[in-house]
Amino acid sequence: MSFPDITPELKAAMPELRGRLLSNEPLAPLTWFRVGGPAQVLFTPADEDDLGYFLPRLPAEIPVMCLGLGSNLIVRDGGLPGVAIRLSPRGFGEHRVEGEMVHAGAAALDKRVAETAAAAQLGGLEFYYGIPGSIGGALRMNAGANGRETKDVLIDATAYDRSGTRKLFDNAAMQFSYRHSGADPALIFTSARLRGTPATPDHIRAKMNEVQAHRELAQPIREKTGGSTFKNPPGQSAWRLIDAAGCRGLKIGGAQVSEMHCNFLINTGEATAADIETLGETVRARVKAQSGVELQWEIKRIGVAPGKG
């Protein structure tokens, strides 16, 4: 499936644009599941100024979606209408220490942020070492692990709205809840300041090793997977509910519930986005029938089915 090419009109309306505009660009290689259709337009801004130039000149009727690292994401097989924005490490990937704070661009890898903090003997950010995403995604979904989450360490975050206005949001304004931020979905986050706590190198390294060991032992990190599929219901573990419903190893097409960890769906090699999403909905239905609990997706699903763009 392909979309009408609108990049010539966009380029004509934005003569000073420095970033890349690509038409009908495949998104599957940019997601951890390696599935899905193309973006009608993929825009990679050169830097914050370039993003601020682009947004107000984009026609209001064209939808915009910021992709992040593509770890907790399913792009449907029909692709993504409108503009997908991908922030590059070159323009948005910095991570540096300022006193007891870490300034991190939205494209900075969570793991690298943890390492940068550790090198400055700042603790409290070790949980990021085990999260396969970027800081932008962490802001959007209040990413967390090992009993800690982004709301515990965020000082403030910078974002751009559709008018190209740069805005600053403190922790309270992010309206964090479990694996969710209540901030306007149209905002594109570009950086964050995170609070660290002075700690000894041995203490920090021990916590990071603990995080890594847990991932190695309990999660299918060498598979094509999007990470945790469903949110844990209050007081319960999603994987236990999935296992109790008999879904461990369940397959639909090329998608499978991981044998190692039931809250992970994997692409065994030939899965489509529809296979993965259908498998997830099947798991939800079986869990609801077995336990009465309605699991909520943690993985974000975007785009359209084939023929519906």
Curated annotation (Swiss-Prot):
PROSITE patterns listed in its UniProt record: FAD_PCMH (PS51387)
GO biological process assignments: cell division; cell wall organization; peptidoglycan biosynthetic process; regulation of cell shape
GO MF: FAD binding; UDP-N-acetylmuramate dehydrogenase activity
EC number: 1.3.1.98
Pathway: Cell wall biogenesis; peptidoglycan biosynthesis
Main location: cytoplasm
Catalyzed reactions: UDP-N-acetyl-alpha-D-muramate + NADP(+) = UDP-N-acetyl-3-O-(1-carboxyvinyl)-alpha-D-glucosamine + NADPH + H(+)
CC cofactor: FAD
GO CC, one annotated term: cytosol
Entry protein name: UDP-N-acetylenolpyruvoylglucosamine reductase
SUPFAM superfamilies: FAD-binding/transporter-associated domain-like, Uridine diphospho-N-Acetylenolpyruvylglucosamine reductase, MurB, C-terminal domain
Subcellular location: Cytoplasm
